[in-house]
Amino acid sequence: MPVLRVPVVALAVVLASLAGAPLSAQVRLADESDRAAFRAWFVLLADAQFERATPDVADCAALIRHAFREALRAHTPEWVRRSALPFAPQFADVQSAPKAGSGGWPLFQISDGPKPQFAEFADARTLIGFNTRPLGRDTKALRAGDLLYFRQPGQKEPDHLMVFVGRSMFDAEGDDWVVYHTGPTPDGPGEVRKVRLATLQQHPAPRWRPLTSNPQFIGVYRLAVL
């Protein structure tokens, strides 16, 4: 089944100020410093799920939604306390991030058309289809915060995403770390796992290797806000 894609809006925009428009995960952050701040927070928060899981992360898409949402928050001392991180990150906040409203925080585009819809929830296929842009199938294109997309036909949940961390703040060695949630398994709720890209490329099951020779590896995708 082909991946649903829409053009990415790359123009500078004034987020969350135009007639109450939501911040779309399909719209690139206008300021380079905001993109750098978002990337730093997103990568850290995805990586941190391996160190201390949070109850809202139950599958691969939930891990990405969590890191995306929390990266946009104001990282106050109270936020740091509640986050249970082992240290207080010194990253700048995303200055153009909107505040959550009374109707929630619909960050993710979930439909196409003249009036696209936005929601707080988006599954793996929707995240890829409406909220990222493809970079091809060569992992040399990976930057920290990019996604690895696999599609496994025959599985109940065929679409699977992993986050490329690169250099981890929790590991002294390695610059090619990848983190992901397995999703529920027949034996339980699943878990967050972390692996080096080089190791993943030699996975015992070839269908999970991020290689151009693997038809189940769809490719590398970048969050459209970046």
Where are these regions (language model features)?
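Low-complexity, Gly/Ser/Thr/Pro-rich intrinsically disordered linker/tail segments
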Residues: 175-226
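...with weaker cross-activation on analogous glycine-rich loops/strands in unrelated enzymes
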Residues: 88-187
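Residues at the start of alpha-helices and the adjacent loop-to-helix junctions
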Residues: 17, 56-59, 137, 154
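N-terminal secretory signal peptides that target proteins for export/translocation
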Residues: 1-4
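Bacterial N-terminal signal peptides
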Residues: 9-18
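N-terminal capping segments
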Residues: 22-119
